[in-house]
């Protein structure tokens, strides 16, 4: 749980205000007043703008220094590090991407040490192990991290089987795993659709659904899914890159 220390409102408001000052055109979510930190993390996710990410990372590290036992702060830091990973992968900077995924893993594992009942944290950990496979030599990284992906997704599902992030991560597991080790494109589509049934606003999940349809050979459904993603988040370079790859 988040700390109730008196310094928190000022720090959280500062984090969100700093992001809005960097991206003044970004609309403030309705929930920003109730959860300024969550709103700041979501604003950074939508754009993957590096200055936003750097500002938010600095704010989170300051909060963690003052509240080192707050599991939620470590989870937010892990998310921000994953967004850095996306940025570096887009640039094809494999070294920086490798450092970012390791930092994300460290933060997420610390979150789970403090609170092992977070479905979001276990789900993110599964995704990060999957990213380790994609960044490494699949012949060696697959056997090392593949079982961990499956284990963390199972933990997340046991904790919250109505969580859209949990279903999306399971979909990525089915999509990215080789068929001989349990990969299943049809199950990945089913999982992504289940995620979207719980939360239809998840643009990234629609991109992954498009990737599944593309792998299945259904380009029409792939284009439709990614067009919905672009409509939901037109400012995301990751979404735009996915759309371009399907054209």
Describe each region flagged by the PLM.
Residues 26-87, 91:
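N-terminal leader/linker segments that initiate helical-solenoid repeat arrays
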Residues 52-55, 91-106, 136-154, 181-194, ...:
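Structural signature of tandem alpha-helical TPR/SEL1-like repeats
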Residues 63, 111, 155-156, 194-195, ...:
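Canonical positions in the second alpha-helix
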Residues 71-72, 119-120, 164-165, 203-204, ...:
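Helix-start (N-cap) detector for alpha-helical repeat units in TPR-like alpha-solenoids
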């Amino acid at each position: 749980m988040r700390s109730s220390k008196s310094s928190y409102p000022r720090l959280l408001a500062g984090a969100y205000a700093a992001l809005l000052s960097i991206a003044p055109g970004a609309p403030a979510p309705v929930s920003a007043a109730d959860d300024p930190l969550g709103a700041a993390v979501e604003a950074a996710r939508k754009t993957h703008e590096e200055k936003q990410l750097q500002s938010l990372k600095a704010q989170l590290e300051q909060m963690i220094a003052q509240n080192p036992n707050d599991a939620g702060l470590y989870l937010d830091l892990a998310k921000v590090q994953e967004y850095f990973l996306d940025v570096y992968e887009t640039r094809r900077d494999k070294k920086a991407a490798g450092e970012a995924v390791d930092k994300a893993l460290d933060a997420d594992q610390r979150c789970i040490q403090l609170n092992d009942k977070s479905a979001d944290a276990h789900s993110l950990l599964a995704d990060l192990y999957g990213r380790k496979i994609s960044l490494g030599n699949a012949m060696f990284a697959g056997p090392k991290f593949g079982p961990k992906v499956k284990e963390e997704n199972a933990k997340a599902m046991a904790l919250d089987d109505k969580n859209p992030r949990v279903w999306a991560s399971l979909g990525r597991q089915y999509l990215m795993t080789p068929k001989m080790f349990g990969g299943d494109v049809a199950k990945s589509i089913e999982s992504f659709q289940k995620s979207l049934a719980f939360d239809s606003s998840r643009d990234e999940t629609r991109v992954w659904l498009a990737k599944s349809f593309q792998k299945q050979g259904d380009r029409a459904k792939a284009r439709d899914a990614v067009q919905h993603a672009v409509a939901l988040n037109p400012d995301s370079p990751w979404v735009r890159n996915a759309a371009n790859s399907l054209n």
